[in-house]
Design a protein with these regions (language model features):
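Short, surface-exposed secondary-structure boundary micro-motifs
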Residues: 19-21, 122, 168, 181
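Serine endopeptidase catalytic core focused on the charge-relay Asp
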Residues: 24, 41-140
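C-terminal cap/linker of serine protease catalytic domains
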Residues: 26-63, 95, 175-244
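Active-site region of chymotrypsin-like
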Residues: 90-102, 127-211
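Short, solvent-exposed secondary-structure boundary/capping segments
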Residues: 10-12, 79-86, 142-152
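Catalytic histidine site
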Residues: 1-45
């Protein structure tokens, strides 16, 4: 889901949020020999990923799609992590046609069970499919992380897409989370997907992940890209021992 696409210093910055398990094959940890430490160390290798954009007539009829290269700029693994990834699109000349409106962080308390929700994703590899439901549960924890549940039907392929909620006050659909998991019912040697019990990463966690990785400019116009880049660079600098 495109969450930011703006021009800064003659260069367009477009960012996409997805699940880590969607792009996990492009994240590799390899053992490399370190000539200074005289031992093998883990080295991260991030392959290029592709983001597919769709074109529509009258907002509803798919007339084509195109893929654009992107870089993985932040992530949290699915195993024991938060199953989240942030991508930066390499096209630095063209803004994205559509950018999701993020649900305001200071309005989270006004999200309730029975609120209508809408899931959008590439269900079973299909071009984006929309489904309608409601927020049905807001207190589940998986691997110690909070998930919300929606009855908007989702299936394999929805991961990394979006869940939206209509804001009556702001008169727009707003991004409230990332479809990430679906419930399954074991049936002998197989399992049935319970499509109306889909778990999604709630928007409050999305905000926290962006903050932890210093990408606050995506949701807060008072914070600049330059400030975030400086903070991220400082965080990545090797820490000096206090005794030095």
């Amino acid at each position: 889901t495109v969450v930011y696409s703006e021009k800064h210093k003659d260069e367009v910055h477009t960012y996409v949020i997805t699940n880590h398990h969607v792009i996990s094959d492009s994240v590799k940890i390899e053992k490399k020999w370190d000539s200074v430490l005289k031992r093998k160390v883990d080295k991260e290798k991030l392959d290029t990923v592709f983001v597919e954009f769709f074109r529509y007539n009258n907002y509803s009829h798919t007339v084509g799609s195109f893929a654009v290269e992107a870089d993985i700029v932040a992530y949290s693994e699915v195993e024991g992590g938060q199953d989240w990834a942030l991508l930066r699109v390499r096209d630095k000349e063209n803004k994205a046609d559509w950018v999701a409106n993020m649900f305001p962080l200071d309005d989270i308390e006004n999200v309730h069970i029975f609120d209508k929700s809408y899931a959008v994703g590439a269900s079973l590899g299909h071009p984006p499919v929309a489904s309608e439901g409601m927020i049905t549960y807001m207190d589940d924890e998986i691997d110690s992380y909070k998930y919300w549940m929606s009855s908007a039907p989702t299936i394999f392929g929805n991961s990394g897409g979006a869940v939206y909620r209509w804001s009556i006050a702001r008169k727009r659909y707003e991004y409230i989370g990332i479809p990430s998991r679906i419930s399954i019912q074991p049936m002998g040697f197989s399992a049935d997907a319970i499509t109306h019990m889909g778990y999604f990463i709630p928007i409050e966690r999305v905000y926290k992940l962006l903050e932890e990785n210093n990408y606050q400019f995506i949701y807060d116009e008072k914070i600049s890209i330059d400030d975030c880049n400086k903070a991220r660079k400082k965080k990545q600098e090797p820490k000096k021992d206090e005794d030095e």
